[in-house]
Amino acid sequence: MISPHSILVVDDEVELATLFKTFLENQGYDVVSFTDPVLALEYFKETFDKHSLIITDLRMPSICGIDLAKEIRQINSKVKIFLMTAFEIRDLKDNEDFKQARIDRLLQKPVRFDNLEQMINESLNVLNIQ
């Protein structure tokens, strides 16, 4: 089944970006992936109303996932944003920048795809209801 939702994946690790893109396309989503967060942001500025969900890594060169999310929020406040990290999630929740970015979900790496699929369905179903 093809989903009406489009997902933007941003991870500086080529293998992970490719893995996420392949998995999500197999779930029926239209997926665009970037390994450079600056290019992803430039692309998003041009296509801000196309994507329902952004999945981004936390630690990347040139711009971190939180700063990317804050920039995206200024462009489109309704898009859902998932932030992935291999580091301790607890430390993020009290971070002021994290709060300003209004992250919808935190994903602990390695990400289990069955959990990811459930989180995506829950988040995008909310969009369908609104």
Regions found by a protein language model. Give the residues of each.
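Two-component/phosphorelay signaling modules centered on CheY-like receiver
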Residues: 14-32, 101
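Acidic catalytic/metal-coordinating carboxylates
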Residues: 35-36, 64-68
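Active-site residues of response regulator receiver
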Residues: 57
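Acidic, metal-coordinating helix/loop segments flanking the phosphotransfer/catalytic sites
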Residues: 33-53
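Hydrophobic/aromatic residues positioned on beta-strands within the core alpha/beta folds
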Residues: 84-86
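Receiver (REC) domain active-site loop signature in two-component systems and cognate sites
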Residues: 60
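Alpha4 helix (beta4-alpha4-beta5 surface) of REC/receiver domains from two-component response regulators
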Residues: 67, 88-105, 118
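C-terminal output helix
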Residues: 108-124, 128
